[in-house]
């Protein structure tokens, strides 16, 4: 079950995941920007079997919010999707909503040590691959080839660079 919200992100109730595929409901999602000691971001390439944005690159960890807070969701998804847990902080919320469908994406950031990075194992049902990418390189890529990235990742990276990386990531 996934949390349904209104246009102002007020909780309405829980719905089955497949009901959101109709495009008639708004849900919540949590996203993690995971940085390594070299300030590279871990990206995952979404599995071709994913309903939303298959085969596109997205955040290090991405999950829909069930009957839980945004924070509880990202903590749970981190362990499920990459097999590690790191301290994180909330950065901002992005409304990716068009015609009363879509999601509120709350973006978090965390940093892992070299040792923790070596322990990362991605969930093959969620992602076909993961890779570490320089932030500047990602910023250029989301502008040059937007179709390769999820809308929430594009909007988040553009916001971070527009407002200053230091404000959010360091």
From Swiss-Prot:
Motif placement: Nudix box: 59-83
EC annotation from Swiss-Prot or TrEMBL: 3.6.1.76
Pfam families cross-referenced by the UniProt entry: NUDIX
Residues forming coiled coils: none
Annotated keywords: Hydrolase, Magnesium, Metal-binding
Pathway(s): Isoprenoid biosynthesis
Protein name per its UniProtKB record: Prenyl-diphosphate phosphatase
């Amino acid at each position: 079950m996934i949390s349904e919200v209104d246009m102002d992100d007020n909780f309405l109730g829980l719905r089955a995941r497949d009901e959101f595929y109709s495009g008639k409901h708004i849900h919540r999602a949590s996203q993690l920007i995971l940085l390594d000691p070299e300030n590279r971001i871990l990206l995952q390439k979404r599995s071709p079997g994913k309903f939303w944005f298959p085969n596109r690159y997205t955040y290090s960890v991405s999950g829909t919010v069930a009957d839980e807070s945004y924070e509880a969701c990202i903590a749970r998804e981190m362990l499920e999707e990459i097999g590690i847990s790191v301290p994180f902080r909330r950065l901002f919320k992005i409304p990716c909503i068009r015609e009363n469908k879509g999601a509120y994406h709350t973006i978090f950031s965390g940093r892992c040590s070299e040792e923790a990075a070596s322990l990362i194992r991605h969930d093959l049902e969620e992602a076909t691959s993961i890779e570490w990418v320089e932030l500047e390189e990602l910023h250029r890529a989301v502008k040059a080839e937007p179709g390769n990235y999820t809308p929430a990742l594009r909007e988040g990276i553009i916001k971070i660079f527009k407002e200053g990386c230091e404000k959010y990531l360091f």
